[in-house]
From Swiss-Prot:
It catalyses: RNA(n) + a ribonucleoside 5'-triphosphate = RNA(n+1) + diphosphate. It comes from Jasminum nudiflorum (Winter jasmine). It is found in: Plastid, Chloroplast. The gene is rpoA. GO terms for cellular component: chloroplast; DNA-directed RNA polymerase complex; mitochondrion. Signal peptide: none annotated. Belongs to the RNA polymerase alpha chain family. It comes from the Eukaryota. This is DNA-directed RNA polymerase subunit alpha. NCBIfam families: rpoA. Pfam families: RNA_pol_A_bac, RNA_pol_A_CTD, RNA_pol_L. DNA-dependent RNA polymerase catalyzes the transcription of DNA into RNA using the four ribonucleoside triphosphates as substrates.
Length: 355
């Protein structure tokens, strides 16, 4: 066994990648260290990160296959070497990378004879295949193979439900996890009261994310989960004096926004905007437009005007409204009354985020 020498910090907590490699298009490996940690801290951090890596990161999969004139899943088709079931299993193995929000459609239309591979799939522009060589079927005769596909972005597992195959639709068990495996080890050094720990973290991914990207996303998800605990339970809302509703006079949009914008400074003091990332569940796919412009946190949004956002490619006004409404509902709910209230969330969002 070869002992490796790894230089670590003895003062400031630091992390770094000590090994990174691409074993194949569908297998990436990365090894990271975090130090110095006090006794017990390494295990606490490792357990949380490993669970987040395996359960909190979203992935993209083919979840349904549609084809006419197929009697059942275990039937065979003349001119195709594989059974329908084998073709479904081949679709299950295809690794996708996407900026998708929810579901979308794709298709294959190929004429034999020849091999059908992942590169024959016709995809929307925001979905790409990690390995185009993945095998789907072998056509032994000059027949047409036309298949419709449903693609979904989600997390964890999706078990196929009982279905009626008469419509030619077949669900597929989906594994949305981009991280194939994650291990950790802990090494101690020092003595007495100066004893510390080094955390080694190993990550394997399916190629849709690099191990470093997976680690960053897992950490962001953990931060999002812990943020509510940073706020006092008795903390009240700046809107609480208005009871159930916020009366909106028949003013122009800008007048309403100016009126609500005065509360921005107070809200900013109460929320660690710098620590709230916007790539959370239930956010629309337009987040990827923001990400492309290096907007990751709510604080990043604060530094942009409405005009700045509207200049971004593929971003429409209704998209901006939608994402800000969701962010307001999710991150500012702790400052609103517990009882049901009525408020124009779009105006509320604009009053906070736009100067």
């Amino acid at each position: 066994m070869v002992r490796e020498k790894v230089r670590v910090s003895t003062r400031t907590l630091q992390w770094k990648c000590v090994e990174s490699r691409e074993d194949s298009k569908r297998l990436y490996y990365g090894r990271f260290i975090l130090s110095p940690l006090r006794k017990g801290q390494a295990d606490t951090i490792a357990i949380g990160i490993r669970r987040a890596l395996l359960g909190e990161i979203e992935g993209t999969c083919i979840t349904r296959v549609k084809s006419k004139n197929v009697p059942h899943e275990y039937s065979t088709i003349a001119g195709i070497q594989e059974s329908v079931h084998e073709i479904l299993m081949n679709f299950k193995e295809i690794v996708l990378r996407s900026n998708l929000y929810g579901t979308c459609d794709a298709s294959i239309c190929v004429r034999g004879p020849g091999y059908v591979t992942a590169q024959d799939i016709i995809l929307p522009p925001y979905v790409e295949i990690v390995d185009n060589t993945q095998h789907i079927a072998s056509l032994t005769e000059p027949i047409d193979l036309c298949i419709g596909l449903q693609i979904e972005r989600n997390r964890g597992y999706l078990m196929k439900m009982p279905h009626n195959s008469q419509d030619g639709s077949y669900p597929i068990d989906a594994v949305f996890m981009p991280v194939r495996n994650a291990n950790h080890s802990i090494h101690s050094y020092g003595s007495g009261n100066e004893k510390h720990e080094i955390l080694f973290l190993e990550i394997w991914t399916n190629g849709s994310l690099t191990p470093k990207e997976a680690l960053h996303e897992a950490c962001r998800n953990l931060i999002d989960l812990f943020i509510p605990f940073l706020h006092k339970e008795e903390e009240t809302s700046p809107l609480e004096d208005n009871h159930h509703t916020v009366p909106l006079s028949p003013l122009t949009f800008h007048d309403k926004a100016d009126k609500l914008r005065k509360r921005k400074k107070e809200i900013k003091k109460k929320i660690a905007l710098k620590s709230i990332f916007i790539d959370q569940s239930e956010l629309p796919k337009v987040y990827n437009c923001l990400k492309g412009s290096n907007l990751y946190t709510l604080l990043d949004l604060l530094n942009k005007s409405q005009e700045d956002l509207m200049k971004m490619e593929h971003l429409r006004l209704e998209d901006v409204n939608h994402i800000l409404v969701i962010l307001a509902r999710k991150h500012f709910a702790i400052y609103l009354p517990n009882k049901k209230f009525e408020i124009d969330f779009e105006i509320y969002c604009y009053s906070i985020f736009f100067h």
